[in-house]
């Protein structure tokens, strides 16, 4: 097993291509590069470094969209009509998880893999995995993500799951409290 360094943007992209929890980076890259698992990989020898050509800024180019501000996005969610219309805590819980995933899928994925109970798995890439960890878990798909989550836990447990993910995503404590307080 070799280690390579990649930039954060590429890491987030690779992590966003995860199809199931536990899928290795090698598996994801093989799938993205359309390599067969048994296909030998030709060694690459780098003999010289090549500098990228300088590109002149053209007036017709559209500006790149600014990076999302996670705190602002969460505040907008809490103030949105779609969120306010949700009467069930489980629906608000799912919408929060969906938004968190859209903000930083790589960190969400890492965090979801580590958040679990003493005997229960809370997040999985498929419904069957959650059903196997308990018959009464009531798994639900998190919209816009490859994840499923248990939903028959009490509200405090749901808050703890969201809190753990938001902490891993480095949200400020006061923002975490605001979001968790709305579940």
Swiss-Prot record:
Name where it mostly resides.
cytoplasm
Q: Which GO terms describe its biological process?
A: negative regulation of DNA-templated DNA replication initiation; regulation of DNA-templated transcription
What is a GO molecular function of this protein? sequence-specific DNA binding
- DNA-binding as UniProt keyword: yes
Question: DNA-binding as a keyword?
Answer: yes
Gene3D superfamilies (alphabetical): Met repressor-like, Replication modulator SeqA, C-terminal DNA-binding domain
This entry carries the following GO cellular component terms, namely:
cytoplasm
User: Where located?
Assistant: Cytoplasm
Q: Where is this region: Interaction with DNA?
A: 118-122
Look up the domain of life of the source.
Bacteria
Q: Where are the transmembrane segments?
A: none
Which InterPro entries does the entry link to? Answer: Arc_rbn_hlx_hlx (IPR013321), Ribbon_hlx_hlx (IPR010985), SeqA (IPR005621), SeqA_DNA-bd_C (IPR026577), SeqA_DNA-bd_C_sf (IPR036835), SeqA_N (IPR033761)
Keywords annotated in UniProt: Cytoplasm, DNA replication inhibitor, DNA-binding
Q: How does it assemble?
A: Homodimer. Polymerizes to form helical filaments.
What does the protein in this record do? Negative regulator of replication initiation, which contributes to regulation of DNA replication and ensures that replication initiation occurs exactly once per chromosome per cell cycle. Binds to pairs of hemimethylated GATC sequences in the oriC region, thus preventing assembly of replication proteins and re-initiation at newly replicated origins. Repression is relieved when the region becomes fully methylated.
Give the family this protein belongs to, as stated in its UniProt record: Belongs to the SeqA family.
Protein name per its UniProtKB record: Negative modulator of initiation of replication
What organism is the protein native to? Proteus mirabilis (strain HI4320)
């Amino acid at each position: 097993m070799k280690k390579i360094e990649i930039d954060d943007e590429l890491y987030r992209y690779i992590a966003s291509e995860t199809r199931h929890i536990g899928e290795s980076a090698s598996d994801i890259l093989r799938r993205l590069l359309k390599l067969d698992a048994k296909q030998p990989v030709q060694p690459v020898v780098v003999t010289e470094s090549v500098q990228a050509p300088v590109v002149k800024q053209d007036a017709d180019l559209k500006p790149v969209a600014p990076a999302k501000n996670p705190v602002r996005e969460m505040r907008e969610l809490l103030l949105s009509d779609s969120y306010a219309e949700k009467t069930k805590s489980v629906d608000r819980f799912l919408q929060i998880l969906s938004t968190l995933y859209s903000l930083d899928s790589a960190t969400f994925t890492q965090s979801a893999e580590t958040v679990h109970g003493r005997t229960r798995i809370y997040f999985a890439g498929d419904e069957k995995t959650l059903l196997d960890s308990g018959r009464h878990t009531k798994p639900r798909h998190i919209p816009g993500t490859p994840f499923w989550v248990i939903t028959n836990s009490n509200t405090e447990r749901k808050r703890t799951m969201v809190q753990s993910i938001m902490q891993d995503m480095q949200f400020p404590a006061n923002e975490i409290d605001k979001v968790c307080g709305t579940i």
